[in-house]
């Protein structure tokens, strides 16, 4: 009994993300935390490490601040693009607000819309925007579309600061509800709308209502499939990123509680910006800060004894560009050893 407990303890204490690299069934990896704790650096570094052990990796930023371009020093957009210097690591940045306009526009400007006279275009827009979280949910749909057409083996999400992250994970449910509602409306008013649309020249892009509904139905099926995958610990995990301070620890705890509520697996925490001053270091601020960090680190280890807690040092310069990111990423798999 005691030996089993000891083995479990050893496993729990491995202070690296190696277990994520070893778990070959993983398809979706979310990296999240509050603003300014090094989420993007961590997600880029994790993606770099994954690219060494997986056939193809896609790194997606859903943070409106889009820091991937800054991190790699290369412009990314809403189409997946290979990261310079890699053959199997691609990245893309999604604008949550752009996607729904694209979807509603699909096929022409508002002024060309044959439904504008009926106020139908506006009605569709109002209907769409009245669903909570729908703008970001559409960006999620955009991701799914890309991911389905480009078969990546593993997808890493660099998510927006905490609040948005958890909403992002609810999107499959939000979209499923919205699409179910639209299907119901289409069933009730479809024939009437089709005859009105027919006399007005149809929907933008020459679609009719049935085409639109079947598109939405196939989207709903994809979403429901992904929703199931998100709740499967073999396929999805969430890496929490924080710093050793009260507010960040509080946010992390809140996030872990919510993830557990959504049945989303999380078993790794990356603690960034740690100070390791030498014993005879005369810098009072460094020593005082280290003392505070030590207190919160102990709390993290106590609270999350069954988590892989990775301790990352505060570096003297920014982690930007391929070489620095690669160097930083090594510390995710080989524990950092501070100088004596």
Swiss-Prot record:
Q: Which GO terms describe its molecular function?
A: ATP binding; ATP hydrolysis activity; guanyl-nucleotide exchange factor activity; identical protein binding; metal ion binding; protein folding chaperone; unfolded protein binding
What keywords does the record list, in alphabetical order? ATP-binding, Cytoplasm, Endoplasmic reticulum, Hydrolase, Metal-binding, Nucleotide-binding, Transport, Zinc
Q: Which GO terms describe its cellular component?
A: GET complex
Name a single GO biological process: cellular response to oxidative stress
Q: Which InterPro entries match?
A: Anion-transp_ATPase-like_dom, ATPase_ArsA/GET3, ATPase_ArsA/GET3_euk, P-loop_NTPase
Q: Which residues form the signal peptide?
A: none
Residues that bind Zn(2+): 283, 286
**UniProt EC number:** 3.6.-.-
Binding-site residues for ATP, renumbered to this chain = 34-41, 245, 272
| Main location (coarse class) | cytoplasm
| Residue numbers annotated as active site | 63
Residues crossing the lipid bilayer are: none
- On whether Amino-acid biosynthesis is a keyword of this UniProt record, the answer is no
Localized where? Cytoplasm; Endoplasmic reticulum
Its biological purpose is as follows:
ATPase required for the post-translational delivery of tail-anchored (TA) proteins to the endoplasmic reticulum. Recognizes and selectively binds the transmembrane domain of TA proteins in the cytosol. This complex then targets to the endoplasmic reticulum by membrane-bound receptors, where the tail-anchored protein is released for insertion. This process is regulated by ATP binding and hydrolysis. ATP binding drives the homodimer towards the closed dimer state, facilitating recognition of newly synthesized TA membrane proteins. ATP hydrolysis is required for insertion.
Instruction: State whether it acts alone or in a complex, and with which partners, per the record.
Output: Homodimer.
Q: What family does the database annotate?
A: Belongs to the arsA ATPase family.
Protein name according to UniProt? ATPase get3
Q: Which organism is it from?
A: Talaromyces stipitatus (strain ATCC 10500 / CBS 375.48 / QM 6759 / NRRL 1006)
What does the record give as the organism's lineage?
A: Eukaryota, Fungi, Dikarya, Ascomycota, Pezizomycotina
Write the gene name.
get3
């Amino acid at each position: 009994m005691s030996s089993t407990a000891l083995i479990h303890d050893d496993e729990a204490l491995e202070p690296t993300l190696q277990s994520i690299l070893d778990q070959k069934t993983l398809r979706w990896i979310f990296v999240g935390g509050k603003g300014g704790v090094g989420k993007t650096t961590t997600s880029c570094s994790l993606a770099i490490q994954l690219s060494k052990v997986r056939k193809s990796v896609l790194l997606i930023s859903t943070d409106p601040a889009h820091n991937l371009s800054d991190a790699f020093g290369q412009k990314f957009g809403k189409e997946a693009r290979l990261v310079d210097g890699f053959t199997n690591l691609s990245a893309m940045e999604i604008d949550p607000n752009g996607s729904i306009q694209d979807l509603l526009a699909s096929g022409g400007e508002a002024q060309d819309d044959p439904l504008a006279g009926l106020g139908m275009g506006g009605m569709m827009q109002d209907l769409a925007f009245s669903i909570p979280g729908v703008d970001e949910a559409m960006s999620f749909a955009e991701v799914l579309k890309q991911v389905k057409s480009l078969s990546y083996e593993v997808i890493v999400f660099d998510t927006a600061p905490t609040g948005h992250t958890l909403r992002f994970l609810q999107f499959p449910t939000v979209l499923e509800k919205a699409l179910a509602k639209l299907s119901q409306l289409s069933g009730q008013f479809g024939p009437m709308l089709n005859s009105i649309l027919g006399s007005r020249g149809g929907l933008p892009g020459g679609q009719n209502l049935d085409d639109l509904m079947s598109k939405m139905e196939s989207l709903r099926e994809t979403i429901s499939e992904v929703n199931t995958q998100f709740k499967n610990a073999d396929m999805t995990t969430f890496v929490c990123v924080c710093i050793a301070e009260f507010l960040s620890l509080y946010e992390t705890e809140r996030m872990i509680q919510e993830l557990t509520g959504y049945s989303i697996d999380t078993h790794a925490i990356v603690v960034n910006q740690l100070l390791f001053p030498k014993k005879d270091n005369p810098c009072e601020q460094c020593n005082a800060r280290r003392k505070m960090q030590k207190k919160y680190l102990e709390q993290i280890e106590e609270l999350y004894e069954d988590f892989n807690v990775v301790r990352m040092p505060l570096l003297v310069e920014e982690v930007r560009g391929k070489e620095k990111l690669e160097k930083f990423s090594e510390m995710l798999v080989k524990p950092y050893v501070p100088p004596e």
